[in-house]
Design a protein with these regions (language model features):
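Pyridoxal 5′-phosphate
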Residues: 1-95
Length: 95
Protein backbone atom coordinates (compact mmCIF):
# COMPACT_ATOMS: atom_id res chain seq x y z
CA UNK A 1 0.00 0.00 0.00
CA UNK A 2 1.46 3.40 -0.91
CA UNK A 3 2.12 6.00 1.76
CA UNK A 4 -0.75 8.47 2.23
CA UNK A 5 -0.43 11.76 0.38
CA UNK A 6 -0.40 14.59 2.88
CA UNK A 7 -1.47 18.11 1.95
CA UNK A 8 1.11 20.84 1.66
CA UNK A 9 1.89 22.50 5.00
CA UNK A 10 -0.23 25.47 6.00
CA UNK A 11 1.81 28.63 5.44
CA UNK A 12 1.48 31.99 7.18
CA UNK A 13 1.59 35.30 5.31
CA UNK A 14 5.13 35.75 6.62
CA UNK A 15 6.19 32.67 4.63
CA UNK A 16 6.82 30.37 7.58
CA UNK A 17 4.93 27.15 8.21
CA UNK A 18 2.07 27.67 10.65
CA UNK A 19 3.36 24.74 12.71
CA UNK A 20 6.64 26.62 13.24
CA UNK A 21 4.82 29.60 14.79
CA UNK A 22 4.31 27.61 18.02
CA UNK A 23 7.03 26.34 20.37
CA UNK A 24 5.61 22.81 20.24
CA UNK A 25 7.48 19.51 20.23
CA UNK A 26 7.82 18.68 16.51
CA UNK A 27 7.72 14.95 17.30
CA UNK A 28 4.15 15.20 18.61
CA UNK A 29 1.02 15.89 16.56
CA UNK A 30 -0.88 18.53 18.52
CA UNK A 31 -4.60 18.61 17.78
CA UNK A 32 -6.08 20.71 20.61
CA UNK A 33 -5.89 24.50 20.43
CA UNK A 34 -9.44 25.15 21.60
CA UNK A 35 -9.82 24.73 25.34
CA UNK A 36 -6.11 24.78 26.11
CA UNK A 37 -2.87 24.79 24.22
CA UNK A 38 0.35 26.56 23.47
CA UNK A 39 0.58 30.25 22.68
CA UNK A 40 2.25 31.26 19.40
CA UNK A 41 5.88 32.29 19.84
CA UNK A 42 5.21 35.81 18.48
CA UNK A 43 2.52 36.32 21.14
CA UNK A 44 4.84 35.14 23.93
CA UNK A 45 7.54 37.53 22.69
CA UNK A 46 5.10 40.45 22.62
CA UNK A 47 3.82 39.59 26.10
CA UNK A 48 7.42 39.56 27.35
CA UNK A 49 8.04 42.97 25.77
CA UNK A 50 4.93 44.39 27.44
CA UNK A 51 5.98 42.96 30.83
CA UNK A 52 9.44 44.52 30.43
CA UNK A 53 7.86 47.90 29.61
CA UNK A 54 5.59 47.63 32.66
CA UNK A 55 8.52 46.66 34.90
CA UNK A 56 10.64 49.57 33.67
CA UNK A 57 8.14 52.12 34.92
CA UNK A 58 5.13 50.74 36.81
CA UNK A 59 4.14 54.24 37.92
CA UNK A 60 3.61 55.24 34.28
CA UNK A 61 2.34 51.85 33.06
CA UNK A 62 -0.54 51.03 35.40
CA UNK A 63 -2.47 54.32 35.19
CA UNK A 64 -2.66 53.82 31.39
CA UNK A 65 -4.10 50.27 31.44
CA UNK A 66 -7.67 51.40 30.68
CA UNK A 67 -6.40 53.47 27.75
CA UNK A 68 -4.38 50.52 26.42
CA UNK A 69 -7.38 48.18 26.66
CA UNK A 70 -9.57 50.71 24.84
CA UNK A 71 -6.95 51.07 22.09
CA UNK A 72 -6.67 47.28 21.76
CA UNK A 73 -10.46 46.95 21.45
CA UNK A 74 -10.53 49.65 18.76
CA UNK A 75 -7.81 47.85 16.78
CA UNK A 76 -9.17 44.31 17.11
CA UNK A 77 -12.91 44.95 16.69
CA UNK A 78 -12.76 45.69 12.93
CA UNK A 79 -10.70 42.52 12.40
CA UNK A 80 -13.50 40.58 14.11
CA UNK A 81 -16.25 42.44 12.23
CA UNK A 82 -17.48 44.05 15.44
CA UNK A 83 -17.77 47.49 17.00
CA UNK A 84 -15.26 48.38 19.71
CA UNK A 85 -18.04 49.45 22.09
CA UNK A 86 -19.58 45.97 21.78
CA UNK A 87 -16.28 44.16 22.41
CA UNK A 88 -14.76 42.98 25.67
CA UNK A 89 -11.69 41.00 26.69
CA UNK A 90 -12.27 38.06 29.03
CA UNK A 91 -9.77 35.71 30.70
CA UNK A 92 -11.26 32.59 29.09
CA UNK A 93 -13.99 32.77 26.46
CA UNK A 94 -14.78 29.07 26.74
CA UNK A 95 -15.40 29.10 30.50
Amino acid sequence: MPAPAFPAPLMLKSGIRARDAWPLDPDVIHLNHGSFGAVPTAVVEHQDALRRRADLSPVEWFPRIAERVRDARERTAPFLGAHAEDSVFVPNASA
